[in-house]
A protein has these predicted regions:
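Short glycine-/aliphatic-rich beta-strand segments at the starts of folded cytosolic domains
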Residues: 36-39
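Acidic glycine-/aspartate-rich tracts in secreted/extracellular proteins
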Residues: 43-44, 64-69, 75-81
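Glycine-enriched, solvent-exposed interface loops adjoining structured elements
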Residues: 1-32, 45-60, 69-70, 83-316
Length: 316
């Protein structure tokens, strides 16, 4: 199923490699974000004051245990968000990689994938009616962060068969005065279109972050192509793995003999490099797929103005 939860599970599977964490189950709904008493089946063996557990993407800190299955808790522990939970929801005890941290890493990777250096994006459109007396158009409802770059500007033609000729001369100005351009964006057209007809702007937009609390949301809401659904878990696993070697270097506890002999320093870094190589290859493939779908058209140049715009200007 293509949901955020599936991404979380894929990330955790890569990091744990078959290791099974201790689980329990809620025996009563958590219907309020201020509720500080939680009941579980009690099948987990480690319930005690100081234990941390998670339900969905919320972390809880146990402040007391009564009867083996009634827990007094702090809510929203560790920077997670307190929310409601249903009866029979799964409880993960002392998770090595909390869900909320995995979701944060997934969003960090979606942002990274949207970098021009990585070449992934979602294509979106907006439109407005052309007015011959107006040169600059406000891109209402958008923000500068939502537009990486504009791909094309076309307008509705008239005739027996409607076409959409391309406007090749335009420029996008950011950080405009919001009293004139409420979005802070001004699209300046240097060539005309048909008055009263729709102008359509296609633009490359960053991938959309996933919800930190609704793990049932579909992955398609990010704007990522289905063929690239394997990328965010790879990036998230890499990000979470980078902090793993730090713990073994703490000076307040002696490392186990297994750490010293079976998992020598550098072993974790080798696993990280394997993930990085796999992600790099997949990223190149998906970026190439987008280039093929939306090829660069060198005749399109927002910096070029028609000759009429330069008339009357001196050479010096």
């Amino acid at each position: 199923m293509s949901t955020t939860q599936a991404w979380v599970d894929n990330t955790r599977d890569m990091l744990l490699s078959g290791y099974v964490e201790e689980l329990d189950v809620l025996t009563g709904a958590i219907s309020s974000t201020s509720q500080t008493t939680v009941t579980v089946q009690g099948v987990a063996s480690s319930w005690a004051k100081g234990v941390v557990f998670e339900v969905n993407s919320e972390m809880f800190y146990v402040t007391g245990v009564a009867g083996g299955n009634t827990l007094s808790v702090f809510r929203g522990y560790g920077g997670s968000t307190a929310t409601t939970h249903a009866n029979s929801d799964l409880v993960r005890v002392s998770p090595k990689f909390p869900t909320y941290r995995i979701v944060q890493s997934l969003n960090d990777d979606l942002s990274d994938l949207s970098s021009p250096d990585n070449g992934l994006f979602q294509m979106k459109t907006t439109s407005f009616d052309y007015n011959a007396s107006v040169d600059g158009y406000n891109l209402a409802g958008l923000t500068s962060d939502e537009i990486n770059s504009i791909y094309s500007v076309t307008y509705a033609d008239v005739g027996v068969e409607a076409t959409e000729p391309e406007i090749n001369s335009w420029t996008l100005k950011r950080n405009r005065d919001t009293t004139t351009f409420s979005s802070g964006l001004a699209l300046i057209l240097y060539t005309p279109a048909w008055p009263g007809k729709k102008v359509t702007v296609m633009y490359k937009s960053p991938l959309t972050a996933v919800s930190t609390t609704d793990l049932t949301a579909n992955q398609s809401l990010t704007g990522l192509a289905p063929t690239a659904y394997d990328l965010p878990p790879l990036g998230a696993a890499m990000a979470l793995m980078t902090t793993t070697p730090i713990r073994r270097e703490f000076l307040d506890a002696e490392g186990t003999s297994r750490m010293a002999e079976e998992v020598p320093p550098g072993a974790i870094s080798a696993s990280f490099r394997d993930l990085m190589g796999r992600r790099r290859a997949r990223l190149q493939a998906e970026a190439g797929r987008l280039v093929a779908r939306y090829p660069q058209m060198w005749s399109r140049n927002s910096a070029v103005r028609p000759a009429s715009q330069w008339s009357g200007l001196s050479d010096g």
